[in-house]
Amino acid sequence: MIKREDVYKIGLFNKPHGIHGELSFTFTDDIFDRADCDYLICRLDDIFVPFFIEEYRFRSDSTALVKLEGVDTAERARMFTNVEVYFPVKHAEEAGPGELSWDFFVGFRVEDVRHGALGKVTDVDTSTVNTLFVVDRDGDELLIPAQEELIAGIDQKHKIITVDLPEGLLSLDECDDEES
């Protein structure tokens, strides 16, 4: 059985394309094209199910048409409408740290070299120029800049990001809490 911690979300199947079972796929990470893995994982009724890729072709930087094995009709393809698509972490790790998308780091623990454990990454905010790790710290949301110069190390095996935050950055969050 595939567990949630063994995969990470890379996109969504939108709707069937044509009559031969192709699916329109919107993705946030093209790891399926860069890593040596011939299947995608779909979340169906809260169960992670692998499907082998028969073929795919890109339509843009964030969309592709995907043909899955055994999905040969538009009717069968409709069953995948709005289905979340995941990729196995073990195959993504083979791609190397420089080739990973930000979504890969959701679920990683964050530790600071001086302050110790900070929490777990629940999301990555890429809506601005400065990408931020959204970290759950005992129920509070902590925003940590995802900048290379602040990251002291990444342990993919144990899912830990070690950061070296500047003095005062963590206390800024505490000041915001006091003003509220």
Swiss-Prot record:
InterPro entries the UniProt entry points to: PRC_barrel-like_sf, PRC_RimM, RimM, RimM_N, RimM_N_sf, Transl_B-barrel_sf
Family: Belongs to the RimM family.
Lineage: Bacteria, Pseudomonadati, Bacteroidota, Bacteroidia, Bacteroidales
All copies of domain PRC barrel, residue ranges: 97-169
Official protein name in the record: Ribosome maturation factor RimM
Record key words, sorted: Chaperone, Cytoplasm, Ribosome biogenesis, rRNA processing
GO cellular component term, pick one: cytoplasm
Domain of life: Bacteria
Organism in which the protein naturally occurs: Bacteroides fragilis (strain ATCC 25285 / DSM 2151 / CCUG 4856 / JCM 11019 / LMG 10263 / NCTC 9343 / Onslow / VPI 2553 / EN-2)
Subunit relationships: Binds ribosomal protein uS19.
Entry's Gene Ontology BP terms: ribosomal small subunit biogenesis; rRNA processing
